[in-house]
Design a protein with these regions (language model features):
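Acidic/polar-rich alpha-helix caps and helix-coil junctions
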Residues: 4-186, 190, 194
């Protein structure tokens, strides 16, 4: 199932998962050759800016039940760009609107109406939209969730499996390391000294 041959060495994924998102569409690897094209990958994307703006608006607003309409607007832009819009799955509701999606398809339909709920939703949207783009580590540190999230076991498929049934068994690959909040806290920036 995984690509492990003498020519390319260990050219395989330890988890069994392969990322297609950041791979140029003309790249190809076969048993006998490898074609790799370099391309300019965007460092900052518009979706990232929209999500940062929505998060900032949510955090800057006073009160817990006072989520600004603009937060929903910018989340909608990100969701619609990725294909979540009215009619895409045959539904009549606009699932690009996070309020509609959570009301219809979740166990907590009131979650988007509170500041804490929107914080959680924005975190989830960032994980989905910006997956494999190098944002998650610093997001986890900024949210102070790193010690909880990075201390979990890493799981994947059994890449040693020779048949499908063995390959697709979820396996614990790494036992979690113990991270502390101190290890993962942001670097302190002191106040600049004033010149008299």
């Amino acid at each position: 199932m995984c690509i492990r041959d003498s020519k390319w060495g260990f050219n395989y994924s330890i988890t069994g998962y392969f990322a297609k998102k950041v791979v140029y569409y003309q790249n190809a690897i076969t048993q006998s050759s490898q074609v790799v094209y370099e391309y300019p990958f965007p460092i900052i994307r518009l979706g990232d800016l929209y999500l940062m703006y929505a998060e900032s608006l949510n955090e800057a607003t006073e009160g817990d039940n006072n989520v600004p309409e603009e937060v929903y607007t910018y989340l909608r832009k990100v969701r619609e760009r990725s294909g979540l819009k009215k009619g895409v799955l045959g539904e009549t509701e606009d699932i690009g609107d996070v309020r509609v999606a959570w009301e219809k398809y979740s166990n907590d339909p009131t979650k988007p109406k509170t500041k804490d709920g929107m914080r959680s939703i924005i975190k989830q949207e960032r994980k989905i939209e910006l997956a494999l783009e190098g944002h998650q580590y610093n997001d986890l540190r900024r949210w102070k969730d790193a010690s909880k999230e990075l201390s979990k076991s890493i799981k994947g498929w059994n890449v040693q499996g020779e048949i499908e049934e063995d390959f697709y068994k979820v396996t614990t690959l790494f036992v979690p390391r113990a991270f502390t909040t101190k290890d993962l806290s942001l670097i302190h920036i002191s106040e600049p000294t004033r010149r008299s």
